[in-house]
């Protein structure tokens, strides 16, 4: 019995993703060629994003959001749904699903987490 397109995509993605959230390595190992003008002034803030593969009649699409131009941080940016981890979040996956619900109304129970990407420090600090 051949795999359906949905199952085939899910299997391919889950084979290439991490099975659990990674333990963050030292900063210099994450982005070895990145040399900021100054080192981080504050400890990084744990956050999570959801890279949602959405099934539509015309095929699968990736979900992006456009952040409001009125926001203090990351205003006007196109981004994956996501944000800071809250103390009540049971995991980074729970945080990403909660943020997707808050930002675009995605019901967490409708999602299936296929895996995790490696931790990445952006080093972004916006000043206005």
Regions inferred by a protein language model and the residue ranges of each:
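N-terminal leader/linker segments that precede catalytic domains of diphosphate-processing enzymes
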Residues: 1-79, 84-128
């Amino acid at each position: 019995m051949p795999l359906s397109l949905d199952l085939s995509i899910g299997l391919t993605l889950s084979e290439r993703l991490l099975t659990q959230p990674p333990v963050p390595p030292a900063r210099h190992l994450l982005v070895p060629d990145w040399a900021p003008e100054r080192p981080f002034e504050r400890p990084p803030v744990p956050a999570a994003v959801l890279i949602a593969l959405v099934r539509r009649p015309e095929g699968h699409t990736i979900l992006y959001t456009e952040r409001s131009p009125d926001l203090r941080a990351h205003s006007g940016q196109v981004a994956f749904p996501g944000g800071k981890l809250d103390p009540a979040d049971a995991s980074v996956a729970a945080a990403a699903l909660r943020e997707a619900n808050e930002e675009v109304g995605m019901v967490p129970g409708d999602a299936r987490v296929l895996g995790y990407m490696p931790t990445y420090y952006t080093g972004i600090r916006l000043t206005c």
